[in-house]
């Protein structure tokens, strides 16, 4: 079991099941861990991506069929797609400050579903983003994957 985390979000596995990703939201960090697919045991973790403070914090996430990790950036007004090397390769701007989770679904797994939050927004911020708390969709070029069930 992982310890020393403040708030863990965005849990997802790579398409081959050999890498586990998660976000430690308060520290602006995405981490990756090698996984033994036979036992499910996690190896040592490594920094996957460090977001700059003030540019959004990684919250919910998912992985697509190319092994890229998608992250919703709380207080960041966007979702990003990161390569397996941890580099941002795509940014999708959102009309809300707090995207909270992204999932890839639909019949072809090419529809992105992004939830958002309106929590603790000032009256002015709420007026500027009346759809905060809503669900948004957009199409992606690379389909998602069905995440494996957790056996532990």
Residue ranges and their predicted role:
Residues 1-3, 44-51, 87-92:
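A short beta-strand motif characteristic of beta-propeller blades
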Residues 20-27, 69-74, 113-119:
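Conserved beta-strand positions in repeat-built beta-propeller and related beta-rich domains
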Residues 28-30, 77-79, 120-121, 135:
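Structural signal for beta-propeller blades
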Residues 33-41, 139-145:
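Short loop/turn segments immediately following beta-strands, especially the blade-tip
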Residues 103-152:
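Blade-level signature of beta-propeller repeat domains, shared across WD40, Kelch, NHL, RCC1
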């Amino acid at each position: 079991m992982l310890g020393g985390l403040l708030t863990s979000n965005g849990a997802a596995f790579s398409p081959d099941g050999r890498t586990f990703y998660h976000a430690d939201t308060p520290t602006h960090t995405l981490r990756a861990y090698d996984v033994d697919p036979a036992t499910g045991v996690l190896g040592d973790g490594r920094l996957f991506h460090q977001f700059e403070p003030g540019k959004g914090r990684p919250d919910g996430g998912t992985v697509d069929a190319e092994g890229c990790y998608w992250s919703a950036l709380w207080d960041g007004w966007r979702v990003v797609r990161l390569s397996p090397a941890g580099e941002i390769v795509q940014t999708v701007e959102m009309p809300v400050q707090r995207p909270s989770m992204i999932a890839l679904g639909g019949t072809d797994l090419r529809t992105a579903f992004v939830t958002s939050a309106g929590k603790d927004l000032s009256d002015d911020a709420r007026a500027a983003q009346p759809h905060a708390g809503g669900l948004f969709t957009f199409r992606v070029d690379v389909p998602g994957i069905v995440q494996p069930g957790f056996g532990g």
